[in-house]
Swiss-Prot record:
UniProt xrefs under NCBIfam families: cyoE_ctaB (TIGR01473)
UniProt protein name: Protoheme IX farnesyltransferase
Function: Converts heme B (protoheme IX) to heme O by substitution of the vinyl group on carbon 2 of heme B porphyrin ring with a hydroxyethyl farnesyl side group.
Keywords associated with the record: Cell membrane, Heme biosynthesis, Membrane, Transferase, Transmembrane, Transmembrane helix
One GO term of the biological process aspect: heme O biosynthetic process
Amino acid sequence: MNQIEKTGELSASRFTVRDFTELVKIGIVNSNTITAFTGMWLAFQLNGISFIQNVDVIFFTIVGSALIVAASGAFNNVIDRDIDGIMERTKNRPTMTGKISGKRALMVALVLGVVGTIMLFMTTWQAGVLGVIGVFLYVVVYSLYAKRKLVSNTVIGSFSGAVPPLIGWFAVEPTFSIVPIMLFLVMFCWQPPHFYAIAIKRKEEYAAAGIPMLPVVKGIERTKKSMFFWVILLTILPFFMFDLGIVYVILATLLNIGWLALSIYGFKMEDSIKWAKWMFVYSLNYMTILFVAMVVISIFL
């Protein structure tokens, strides 16, 4: 065993809680768990199902969703080890520094994925199947193929990112209705402008890593047009969500108008990087306010 291997093995044996949270991408785990909770909460509220009497469903849904998202993040870190070292924002991930070896990261991902999937199947089989589909789309379709091969990688990756609210809904009420469909579409349409904002800020890094992000391949102006398109789609969705009441529709519409105005301003603003930062921050606040509002407003319906 050479010195590098010894150092890597020593580091991997000492990885911390922080290393673990970075491996599973805890920020993404948290945000996706919130959307899963929202889907679950709305299923309880809108279908007159007791929240208190289904503590087991709540537990298995929330923890199961968090675990499969964490597994997906860990799988992604294992897959991207060959390019993470090139990018500034990913070069210090524990799989790159040697704090967590590729083998150990893979084992963590497998365990999290299996346990999370079992927990989701303990609610309804539909929730379990959706969990499996979400992991497959993110790990296999997106991480292994689309991310490195297709300019449409962000849109393709948005399918998996829109699955958690469906899991939450179907864990409680395993039938289709307009609400879970709209939750899926909100998440699906929100992701391209959110991640394109990151791609604009990190354009040079993505180019160096050979990742065909839209700003790299088609340019920033083309990316701005695409972001504008997805925000327009978002402005339509509240009008199909009157089940959540007029207050929600008005709030969502105001948020959409604000984002639409910021998107339009991007065509006039010369500093595209600064504008992308504004779009990124707005997207985070948008999603937080929107999903918290869904939960709070539904209490009074």
